[in-house]
Amino acid sequence: MGEAWSGSLIKKHLTELADVIGPRWGGSDGDHRAAEYIREQMEAAGLDRAEIESFTIDTWSHGDVSITLPDDPERVIASLPFLRCKPIDVTTPLVDVGHASPHEVDALGDRIKGSIVLASISPEPFTSPEPFTARIARLAKAGAACIIAIEPKTGGRMEYASTDEWLNVSPQKDALAVVKTSLEDGAYLQRIATTSPAIRVSVDAKYLDSEGHNTVAEIKGTTHPERHLILGGHHDTVLGTAGGNDNTSGTIGVMETARVIAALGSELGIKPGMSIRFATWSGEEQHLQGARAYVAHHHSPSSPSREANPLLNINLDELSTGHMKGIVLSFPHLRKFVQAQLDTMDDGLKCHVLDHMDAHSDHFPFVEEAIDASMTWRWRFFGRHEDANFHHEIGDAANKLNVRELKEYAGQLARILLRLSHVVPDDWPTNPMTVEDVNQMIERDAGGHHSAFH
């Protein structure tokens, strides 16, 4: 797999996607330009087909956002809306709710109702951890008018975050407004909150329909072309960032793996048995809308274009946060089968199974249809690179992409995909999961806390 190193186009793709095109919010011009570039590069790499699949995306944008103190108008308070924050302009006394744990909310009682509340995103120490989305729901139930959420990262950094649960909730337009402030400004507001100062939160935002653009390319199999595997990753970013790590790294991982496998076929005659599909998604940062549109079109029982399900989806997201350690499955029945294939590579790669439903990347729309889906084992589980602790923020620039490790990803992914493609479809373990099974698992896990770093 030396082609992953000697013929690497990573720096070329990084320059175009991160520096030339830049931010690629789903439904924006940057999203469209990225899709066109990816399609052109897949064609140039010699894949059998490379197309753009457009879809209607329920998107959002914001204008001016501010947190101000009417009695101290010269004081500048950092502000950033949560994604899909509704427009709001409200002034109330400030109420500090700490971490918004149950005992803190109960103790404040009616003071929360109709007030702007200040809450730490970090969970309360020595208590059962719960996601901030659950604490947002608690504050909404208590009648808060708006939340100022304190960013846990230091040094004035702030990253876009989501207000709502992704496991069983579609994109919202009427959720409680949440605006983030920096750790430093949050500490200042905590200091003055004991005096209940007046505070104003203003967000100019709108919801609109636009056109998102997925890319779908394919190398046809030689023995079972009617069945396929799929390698995917989202090419969109949040607003205002080039997304070097999240997810230019995963996008280029898809592109480079496709190029390497295509080159093996054209130069050495080594071709996949089953077809291998390579996709990049728009709208991941907006409730996985691109991957959901693809699954609805290709695999929904009600779709006139329905085709056979992929035998496995492998999702690439934030690859620069750690080197490849293996594959993590959503369902357990493929564990021994995939591990046996990894063992033939003799690189110590391991196959594991998630113990919960994870809706935070583009494998999940496949999971919802009970399709076998997985992601690479990297930062979510062990060994996150500290210098790559960037995703939904301006600092996630081109220099956050780890070029050397991405070459390794492309080589390793090409090897595992080729091995899997040459296993006769009938020899794969049968998938016993149903959509009903998955829905029960989603309901079981919705609102729960699942550590991302363990």
Regions found by a protein language model. Give the residues of each.
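Second-shell loop/turn segments in exported
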Residues: 1-5, 19-29, 81, 94-96, ...
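N-terminal capping segment at the start of a domain
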Residues: 2-29, 45, 159, 166, ...
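Soluble metallo-hydrolase cores and metallopeptidase-like ectodomains found primarily
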Residues: 72, 76-106, 166-244, 256-259, ...
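Short helix-loop-beta-strand segments that form the rim/entrance of peptidase-like active sites
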Residues: 12, 261-289
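His/Asp/Glu-rich mid-to-C-terminal helical/loop segments that flank catalytic regions of hydrolases
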Residues: 384-454
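Noncatalytic luminal/extracellular "stalk/propeptide" segments of secretory-pathway proteins
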Residues: 7-8, 12-116, 122-123
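Extracellular/luminal Protease-associated
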Residues: 28, 77-171, 175-177, 242, ...
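Metal-dependent peptidase/peptidase-like ectodomains
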Residues: 186, 281-385
